[in-house]
């Protein structure tokens, strides 16, 4: 047997040769790593000395040549180059030679890995984690920062009960289930920490009953985007809040004016302005007087011009001012909207159009009356007044414009929209009850001469009022049978209305708490952003100094945990701890290559 020390091109290495077979060797790789079996993070079987190595030692002990002395110093590992880093796999799993890759790929797939979650250890296979390579546990580079070489495991200081659901996500191939003893916000934080992705988060929210938030598109043009934010989102800026305040004041003034103009004293003044009294006509001169023949000075009472009188009405002036603002706001929002089709289909925009439409019809009708012969026929005037009353009634819908600036009205609208099925059931149950009890009370009161129910349709009103527990008292049963029917009608109405009400209340609570949670999260994000900016200004200089002194600070610098970033602080000790972890990793690899049980021998 012959033993010799053979120098290598890329670094010194010791090779034992005996009996024509190559013995154990320790070769320094170009990257400064030892070419050894993949062991980091794996729960492998205990190592046994290879037969070749045992034979070599036995031959050396039986009188062969003594082993050459160990080198005094091991060559220092150099930093990996950019080309090596591109093809580098999981450093915690060692390296695999190209000719051994096909044979070892299957074994690596079934290798076991230990994961320590705040002291609770989980054991799984690499193939299970590799199903989702974009996640924290599935990506070898991402999970390396949490590897502990001394314990040969990955350590995460996270919530332990939540990891049952996280590990089940890998084992089940993508099914995410929240443990019953973990709250929603905690499990959502764990999903974000382990980087399971937006798709997993959306599925989790849908399974938990969350309604998907609709994305709000913005115009592409910068000017249109700014205008759209000012008029559509009052919370976006200070100018948007000012515009919202002006809009709310105009809406309130319009509604107050709509109500005050119906008071008797104001209505009488408006009638005087619209139709002032005609002064008495002088008597006609006698026939033949002043040498003139008989003539008629006037054919009837004259009507004063209406246009100046109408424009002098203060209610008309206030209404015109409000409509000018509403029209300006509608046109600006239509100009800046991201989609004209979506804008036209929006129910709130339809309400805005309906709110200003009656004014122009009323103004056109009054201007038409000023034309000669415009108001000659009384029948046409009566028809015009009836149409104007109906059109003016539409102005009351302006109150719904407040929902654009009120979160409470928006929550109420979303609640009614989500409870349409329950409201439909309520109306259907009331319809059945009205038919049954109106028919019953009619036949129960049919023989009584003083009955208030002349027909079944006439009893519909009584049934509706009784089932809704209002009871005006204008129609009431008199006989004993009619009173029994009325009692049953009232009881049935209470039960019918009470059944769908809890569902509607539950929907209201859901939307209310969701809105308050969004406001709290927005405030929290704003505070965190301020703290992050302040901490970045305070610790920027210190971080540069520490990185210049620590040799491995460049590696440990970008590996700050998301928790520390979320808190807005980055302890300086983390650079030193990660540098020490990398040194321990290389020391462990050298000790394993030399088959020595003590790392201090290095």
Curated annotation (Swiss-Prot):
Major place of residence: membrane
- Compositionally biased intervals (Pro residues): 66-78, 276-286
Write out the topological domains of type Cytoplasmic.
Answer: 1-238, 337-347, 406-420, 513-602
Cross-link entry Glycyl lysine isopeptide (Lys-Gly) (interchain with G-Cter in SUMO), positions:
212, 525
S-palmitoyl cysteine-type lipidated residues: 337
Cite the record's tissue specificity text: Expressed in the heart (at protein level). Expressed in the brain and weakly expressed in the thymus, skeletal muscle and spleen.
Region (S4-S5 linker) residue spans: 407-420
Q: Which residues form a coiled coil?
A: none
Q: How does it sit in the membrane?
A: Multi-pass membrane protein
- Disruption outcome: No visible phenotype. The action potential in myocytes is not prolonged by low concentrations of 4-aminopyridine, contrary to the situation in wild-type.
According to the record, the residues making up region (Disordered) are 1-107, 274-297
Function (record text): Voltage-gated potassium channel that mediates transmembrane potassium transport in excitable membranes. Forms tetrameric potassium-selective channels through which potassium ions pass in accordance with their electrochemical gradient. The channel alternates between opened and closed conformations in response to the voltage difference across the membrane.
- Provide the protein name: Potassium voltage-gated channel subfamily A member 5
What species is given as this protein's source? Mus musculus
């Amino acid at each position: 047997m012959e033993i010799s020390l053979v120098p290598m091109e890329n670094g010194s290495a010791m090779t034992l040769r005996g009996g024509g077979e190559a013995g154990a060797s320790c070769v320094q790789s170009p990257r400064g790593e030892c070419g050894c079996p993949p062991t980091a993070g794996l729960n492998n079987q205990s190592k046994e000395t290879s037969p070749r190595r045992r034979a070599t030692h036995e031959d050396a002990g039986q009188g062969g040549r003594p082993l050459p002395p160990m080198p005094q110093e091991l060559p220092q590992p150099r930093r990996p180059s950019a080309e090596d880093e591109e093809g580098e796999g999981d450093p915690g799993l060692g390296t695999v030679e190209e000719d051994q890759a096909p044979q070892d790929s299957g074994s690596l797939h079934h290798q076991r890995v230990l994961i320590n979650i705040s002291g609770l250890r989980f054991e799984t296979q690499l193939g299970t984690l590799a199903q989702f390579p974009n996640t924290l546990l599935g990506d070898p580079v991402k999970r390396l920062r949490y590897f502990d070489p001394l314990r040969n495991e990955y350590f995460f200081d996270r919530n332990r009960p939540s990891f049952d659901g996280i590990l089940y996500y890998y084992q089940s191939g993508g099914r995410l289930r929240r443990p019953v003893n973990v709250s929603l916000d905690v499990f959502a934080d764990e999903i974000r920490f382990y980087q399971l992705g937006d798709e997993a988060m959306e599925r989790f929210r849908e399974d938990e009953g969350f309604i998907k938030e609709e994305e709000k598109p913005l115009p592409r043009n910068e000017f249109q985007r700014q205008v759209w934010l000012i008029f559509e989102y009052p919370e976006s800026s200070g100018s948007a809040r000012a515009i919202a305040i002006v809009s709310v004041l105009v809406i309130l003034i319009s509604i107050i004016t709509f109500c005050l103009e119906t008071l008797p004293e104001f209505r009488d003044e408006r009638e005087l302005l619209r139709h002032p009294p005609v002064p008495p006509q002088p008597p006609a001169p006698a026939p033949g007087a002043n040498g003139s023949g008989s003539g008629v000075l006037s054919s009837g009472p004259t009507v004063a011009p209406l246009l100046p009188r109408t424009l002098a009405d203060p209610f008309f002036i206030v209404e015109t001012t409000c409509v000018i603002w509403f029209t300006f706001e509608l046109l600006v929002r239509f100009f800046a909207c991201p989609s004209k089709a979506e804008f036209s289909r929006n129910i709130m925009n339809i309400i805005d159009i309906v709110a200003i439409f009656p004014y122009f019809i009323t103004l056109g009708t009054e201007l038409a009356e000023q034309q000669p012969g415009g108001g000659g026929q009384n029948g046409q005037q009566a028809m015009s007044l009836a149409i104007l009353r109906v059109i003016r009634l539409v102005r009351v819908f302006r109150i719904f414009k407040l929902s654009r600036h009120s979160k409470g009205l928006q929550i109420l609208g979303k609640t009614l929209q989500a409870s349409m099925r329950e409201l439909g059931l309520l109306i259907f149950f009331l319809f059945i009850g009205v038919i049954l009890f109106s028919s019953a009370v009619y036949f129960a009161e049919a023989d009584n001469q003083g009955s208030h129910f002349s027909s079944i349709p006439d009893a519909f009103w009584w049934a509706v009022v009784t089932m809704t527990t209002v009871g005006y008292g204008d129609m009431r049963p008199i006989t004993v049978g009619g009173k029994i029917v009325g009692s049953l009608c009232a009881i049935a109405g209470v039960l019918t209305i009470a059944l769908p009400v809890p569902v509607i209340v539950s929907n209201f609570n859901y939307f209310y708490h969701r809105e308050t949670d969004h406001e709290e999260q927005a405030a929290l994000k704003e505070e965190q952003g301020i703290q992050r900016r302040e901490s970045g200004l305070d610790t920027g200089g210190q971080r540069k100094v520490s990185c210049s002194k620590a040799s491995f600070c460049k590696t440990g610098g970008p590996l700050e945990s998301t928790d520390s970033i979320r808190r807005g602080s980055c302890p300086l000790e983390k650079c030193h701890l990660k540098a020490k972890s990398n040194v321990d990793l290389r020391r462990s690899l050298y000790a394993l290559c030399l088959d020595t049980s003590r790392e201090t021998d290095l």
